[in-house]
């Protein structure tokens, strides 16, 4: 069963400006510990794109759930990782998912400076969704 679809676009220069003002604070505010571990391995030149893609992805996933960030789900409730081939994998905090039936999240990320885009589709095998 289809639950929802969400998309988000982020201007990479906007993230670059934020990083210039708050180099460590912004990453710690939006990334989970697993994402911060990946982030710390990157060269600084890749920081803005990494953060822009993660922010867009989290917004897209929250929109697909039909709630939006801060409206029942927070940035740190969503973790975006990659499998061995680079495919995005989404993990959602059990604090949020305990109210939901089993679901799958499909996520696509792309960037072409100065923008990045995220597209998320959420599906469930159950017929009823309670929030």
Curated annotation (Swiss-Prot):
Gene field: acpS
Recorded catalytic activity of this chain's protein: apo-[ACP] + CoA = holo-[ACP] + adenosine 3',5'-bisphosphate + H(+)
Gene3D superfamilies: 4'-phosphopantetheinyl transferase domain (3.90.470.20)
Keywords: Cytoplasm, Fatty acid biosynthesis, Fatty acid metabolism, Lipid biosynthesis, Lipid metabolism, Magnesium, Metal-binding, Transferase
InterPro entries registered for this protein in UniProt: 4-PPantetheinyl_Trfase_dom, 4-PPantetheinyl_Trfase_dom_sf, ACPS, Ppantetheine-prot_Trfase_dom
Necessary cofactors: Mg(2+)
Enzyme class: transferase
Protein name from the UniProt record: Holo-[acyl-carrier-protein] synthase
Residues that coordinate or bind Mg(2+): 8, 59
Function: Transfers the 4'-phosphopantetheine moiety from coenzyme A to a Ser of acyl-carrier-protein.
GO biological process: fatty acid biosynthetic process
Assigned protein family: Belongs to the P-Pant transferase superfamily. AcpS family.
GO molecular function, one term: magnesium ion binding
Residue pairs linked by disulfide bridges in the UniProt entry: none
Enzyme Commission designation: 2.7.8.7
Record-level GO cellular component terms: cytoplasm
Organism: Rickettsia felis (strain ATCC VR-1525 / URRWXCal2)
Subcellular localization(s) per the UniProt record: Cytoplasm
């Amino acid at each position: 069963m289809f639950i929802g679809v969400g998309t988000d676009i982020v201007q990479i220069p906007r993230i670059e400006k934020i990083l210039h003002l708050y180099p460590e604070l912004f990453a710690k505010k939006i990334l989970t510990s697993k994402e911060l571990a990946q982030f710390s391995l990157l060269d600084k030149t890749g920081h803005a794109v990494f953060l822009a893609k993660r922010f867009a992805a989290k917004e897209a996933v929250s929109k697909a759930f039909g709630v939006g960030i801060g409206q029942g789900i927070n940035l740190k409730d969503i973790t975006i990782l990659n499998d061995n081939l680079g495919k995005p994998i989404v993990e959602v905090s059990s604090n949020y998912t305990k109210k939901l039936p089993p679901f799958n999240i499909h996520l696509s990320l792309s960037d072409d400076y100065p923008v990045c885009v995220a597209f998320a589709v959420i599906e469930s095998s159950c017929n009823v969704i309670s929030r």
